[in-house]
Amino acid sequence: MPLWTHAELLAATGGAPSGVFDADGVAFDSREIGKGDLFFALKGEATDGHLFIEKAFANGAAGAIVSEPVDFPHILVTDTFEALQALGRAARLRMQGRVVGVTGSVGKTGTKEALFAALDRSSRGKAHRSVKSYNNHVGVPLSLARMPRDTEYGIFEMGMNHAGELRGLTALVRPHCAIVTTIAPAHIEFFKDESGIADAKAEVFEGLTDDGVAIIPRDNVHFDRLDTAARKYAKSTVSFGFSEKSDVRLLDHVSTKGGETLITAKLSGATMCYCLSQPGEHWISNSLAVLAAVEAVGGDLAAAGLAMAELGGLAGRGARHQIAVQNGTALLIDESYNANPASMSATLSELGKVDGRKIAVLGTMKELGDKSPEYHLALAEPLAAAKVDFTILVGEEMQILAEKLRAGVEGVSVIAHCASAHEALEVLNRELRVSDTVLVKGSNSMGLSAIVSSLVGGKS
């Protein structure tokens, strides 16, 4: 059976048909269209999807949702974005399984992927999740619209930059379980303070089903604020963390030389031991949230434990690569997709545990507003604690940190400040040695992924 029959598409969108077609997939990017897919011609500030209709059908589209008549099979609607939202709502309405929503300042994508791995194993392949970082007003309804009708578990990441944005997303997702991974100064440029971020993240609870469960970080300074907000909408709340007050809490952990972490955790019904393939306390915290969610939606905890032992690092979010250097190899840690003060500190802490020579390539942290100088200067402390041997800072907003480090900070050896990723790559290529560990981390707009691509591809 197709993902969407023609009758279902008409019922969901309320559009006028021209031609009859079913859809096996859904996309709004003509480059992602496969045979039998439905193409949404969305209009944005930068471009208009109607300009790519021919390309979409050349790539195999079965039909399109359009707001202007075209010479291909289509359904004509007044607003294609509203039609996408309507199809997302229809997908959620027909889904008979359990749905989890994931948000937070840090760790959304990693937690979403770990939870998907756990529930996909638990359901023998009947789990669905939002791909990439499709967590905004377009990505969330698209991810819902792609959900197969027989899905047992749906996992959806929801992000926001401003207050009020999550309210609309969670109304679409209507989760049975909502996770807030943590609250930290990400996107603080758009908020008065962290409390404002906490309030905005807490909007995710407003969409909970009547039997909904809120999962919140017990160790976070904004726990009480989140807990108060959650109790207005959730039937029950579950806290996770390292604190003895946590409902799901860490009892013990041991790091292995291979980078794995052996964990003993207390859940509501049992004590559980499992291996986590990713290093770091932030990943331990994420894994506790995952277990809390698996338990909340009735998943298999044993399967979840096995899945977390097999997690691979995500591109731009912790993936590790052995790269070729003269006379041998070096380890590259790819954190090039995102950066904020909390994730920078956590990642540098893990870098500090690595044996051998350490290099950190750090790009500007964006969307920090007036607090940007303060937060960039504060990176001196985790850099010093990690005893990084060579630090390459990238971007104008890193200048203030470069000046501080050059003035002398104990534990920081050598630094370079570069204007661009290209310049940083040239410096890095001159410095790389056998057995080095290189961390590349910065906001996505800094383009540090180009450094990773060059090193992994063996280019210089």
Task: Please give the residue ranges for each predicted region.
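N-terminal leader/targeting and accessory segments in enzymes
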Residues: 1-86, 90, 355-356, 381-382, ...
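Acidic, Mg2+-coordinating active-site environments of NTP-dependent enzymes
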Residues: 7, 67-71, 179-331, 356, ...
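Residue-level signal for inorganic ion chemistry
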Residues: 9, 37, 56, 87, ...
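Active-site beta-alpha connecting loops in nucleotide-dependent enzymes
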Residues: 46, 314, 336-410, 417
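Short beta-strands and strand-loop turn motifs
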Residues: 67-68, 97-103, 128, 179-185, ...
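Short acidic-hydrophobic, aromatic-tinged amphipathic segments that line or gate anion-handling sites
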Residues: 75-79, 414-424
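Phosphate-binding loop of NTP-binding sites
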Residues: 83-218, 224-233, 430-431, 453-460
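ATP-dependent carboxylate/acyl-activation modules
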Residues: 102, 108, 315-321, 437, ...
